[in-house]
Each structure stands twice: as C-alpha cells, then as structure tokens.
Amino acid sequence: MIEIRKGLEISEELLSEIENAVDITFEDEATQKKLKASIARGIGRIRSWSSDLSLDVESDDTARQLLIDYVRYDLNGMSDAFRENYAPDIASLRLRKEAAAVGEEETTDI
C-alpha cells in the first residue's frame, strides 16, 4: 500500500493504473507529490458525491474509474468541469450506494 496522505492509502496497482492513465512514465518527487494530492482530493470528492464516506475506490469499479478520470481532469486544471461532464456516472454511483444502504436497513429491520 502507498500512503497518499496521513490515514489514506491506495494499492500500488491503483497508483500504477492512475500513473499510466495520466501518462506519468518517470519517477519525480514533485510530480508524485502533485499526483498524490490530486488522488486524495479525488477520493474525498467521490466519497462525498456518492454519500458513502467509506467508499472503497479499490474494489468499486465505478468509483475506481471516476477517480482515474478525476485525477486526469485535476492534473490538467479542469477539476471544475469534471462533475458536470461525469454527472450521470456520479448520479449512478450515488443511487447504487443509496439503494444498497436502504437494502441493508430493510434486512436489519426483519
């Protein structure tokens, strides 16, 4: 696991996948610092938008792809446009998470 910031880690596999998606092909301390900050922002925003603050971007395919795309936008100075351009994907993730939460509540009420 790679520490992105204190208390937030991602797998080396996900970091490598993000680096590949944004065409980072070299080890540079400043670039890694910027990349990790972008990943941390992305995880925070995606969790917030999904209404699931413990959302696992490693195992949820939609969240994982949203994170990769968010980082791509963010590193290109376009993070403001991300939410608008990915609104259907964000809404789908949120609805799926809310439906799962309702299903869990109904199960525990039985």
Residues covered by each model-derived region:
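Conserved short "hinge" loops at termini or chain/domain junctions
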Residues: 1-63, 95-110
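General helical structural elements
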Residues: 45, 68, 76, 87, ...
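Mid-chain, well-packed structural core segment of small domains
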Residues: 55-79
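Intrinsically disordered, low-complexity regulatory regions of eukaryotic regulatory proteins
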Residues: 72, 87, 103-107
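C-terminal structural segments of small proteins and small subunits
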Residues: 75-95
